[in-house]
C-alpha cells in the first residue's frame, strides 16, 4: 500500500438561485499507509464534504484523489465508512451485521466465520453476537459498526464523528478501542471530530480546517496517539504538551467562529 494522495481538491456547490458555495478550495494532503489523521474545524469548513469525496460519494469540482496508485472515481471496498449513527441493520443480529460485507463478497463460510469471530472478540461483543442491534446501547452499536467496517478489510477507514453521540465514559472507552484497532490492523484512518481533545488523543497528525472556502489552515504532528496505545488516556492528557496544544487549537477555532459570526452580522 502506497497511501492516499489528495491533490488540489476543490468542491463547488451550485444553488437553485444561481449562486454557489465554494465548500473546498485547493486542498492537498498526503497520507502514508497506516497513518491516523484527525480533522478539526468550525462548522461549515468542509470536513464532511472532504470525507465524502474521499469515500467516493461526491465527485470533486476539480482535483484528484489517488489511493494505492489508482484514481478514486466512486465508492469501493478499499474505503470503509463509520458514521456518527451506526447505520446498522437493526433487525439483524450483531453477527449478521458484521458478516454482511463478507457475505456479499462471497467469502467462503469458514473464512467468514473466522473473521467475524475474531472481530467480535476484538471489540468485546462475543457474548452479544446473537442479540439484535436494537437491543444494544449506543456504545455497543458503534463497536458493531467498527467491526462491520473492518470485516470488509478496507485499506482506509473514514470516521465521521463516530463517537459524538456517546456519553463521556463510553466515549473514552471507544477512543481507546479505536487506538487499539489502529495499531493491530495497520489501517489508514481519517477521523472527523468536533472535539479538540479527541483529535489530539487519536491523531498522529491533525489538520485544522478554515471555512469560506474550506481549506487546510494548520497541520500538527502529535505524539499522543502512540502514547495512548499502551497507556490510560487520562494519563496521556497529563503530558506537558497536551494542555498548551489544546488551548492553542481551541483559541484558533474560536477565532474562526467569531469571524464567521461577525460576517453574518455585517451581512445582516
Curated annotation (Swiss-Prot):
SUPFAM superfamilies recorded: P-loop containing nucleoside triphosphate hydrolases (SSF52540)
Keyword Cell membrane part of the UniProt annotation: yes
Annotated localization: Cell inner membrane
Key word RNA-binding present: no
Pfam family, one: ABC_tran
PROSITE patterns: ABC_TRANSPORTER_1, ABC_TRANSPORTER_2, TAUB
Subunit-structure text: The complex is composed of two ATP-binding proteins (TauB), two transmembrane proteins (TauC) and a solute-binding protein (TauA).
Name of the protein in its database record: Taurine import ATP-binding protein TauB
Highest classification ranks of the organism: Bacteria, Pseudomonadati, Pseudomonadota, Alphaproteobacteria, Rhodobacterales
Gene: tauB
Amino acid at each position: 500500500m502506497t497511501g492516499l494522495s489528495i491533490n488540489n481538491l476543490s468542491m463547488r456547490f451550485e444553488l437553485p438561485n444561481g449562486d454557489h458555495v465554494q465548500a473546498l478550495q485547493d486542498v492537498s494532503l498526503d497520507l502514508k499507509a497506516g497513518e491516523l489523521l484527525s480533522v478539526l474545524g468550525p462548522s461549515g469548513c468542509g470536513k464532511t464534504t472532504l470525507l465524502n469525496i474521499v469515500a467516493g460519494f461526491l465527485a470533486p469540482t476539480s482535483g484528484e484523489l489517488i489511493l494505492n496508485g489508482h484514481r478514486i472515481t466512486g465508492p469501493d471496498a478499499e474505503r470503509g465508512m463509520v458514521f456518527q449513527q451506526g447505520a446498522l441493520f437493526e433487525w439483524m443480529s450483531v453477527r449478521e451485521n458484521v458478516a454482511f460485507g463478507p457475505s456479499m463478497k462471497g467469502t467462503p463460510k469458514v473464512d467468514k466465520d473466522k473473521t467475524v469471530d475474531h472481530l467480535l472478540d476484538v471489540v468485546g461483543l462475543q457474548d452479544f453476537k446473537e442479540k439484535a442491534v436494537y437491543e444494544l446501547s449506543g456504545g455497543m452499536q458503534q463497536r458493531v459498526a467498527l467491526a462491520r467496517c473492518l470485516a470488509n478489510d478496507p485499506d482506509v477507514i473514514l470516521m465521521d464523528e463516530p463517537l459524538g453521540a456517546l456519553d463521556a465514559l463510553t466515549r473514552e472507552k471507544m477512543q481507546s478501542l479505536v487506538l487499539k484497532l489502529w495499531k493491530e490492523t495497520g489501517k489508514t484512518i481519517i477521523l472527523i471530530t468536533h472535539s479538540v481533545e479527541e483529535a489530539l488523543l487519536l491523531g498522529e497528525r491533525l489538520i485544522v480546517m478554515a471555512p469560506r472556502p474550506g481549506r487546510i489552515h494548520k497541520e500538527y504532528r502529535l505524539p499522543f496517539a502512540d502514547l495512548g496505545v499502551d497507556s490510560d488516556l487520562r494519563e496521556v492528557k497529563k503530558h506537558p504538551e497536551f494542555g498548551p496544544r489544546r488551548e492553542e487549537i481551541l483559541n484558533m477555532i474560536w477565532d474562526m467562529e467569531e469571524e464567521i459570526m461577525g460576517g453574518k452580522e455585517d451581512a445582516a
